């Protein structure tokens, strides 16, 4: 059973919040677009007109960041880079997750170019903005051909 305390939904048994997300990490796109490496097993991807996509993605990202901040959500923005080329970098939820006990989990990724998304700037932003007490790094499973994208 859950109860509402102010604007927070609380688990009546544990007294802990059911939803604690007031902060999100977003990657501001630079070269967002179709990813040949992930298209082989991602039904959501459709090849389209590539020319306008990076600019449109940046504009949409900026608008979304502004909307979130206007509604009280703290947005940690990591600027993407041109190199290495990471067309899916706007989806960092696939390579890491944070948990309310201070755990950071790093996940093994299928596509080699998705693994390049674990850029120092993104990892630094996570370390600086979340109280990381423990890290579970599952990325070594990539070497065994095992993948678990968050």
Give the role of each language-model region:
Residues 1-150:
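The feature marks the mature, well-folded catalytic cores of soluble enzymes
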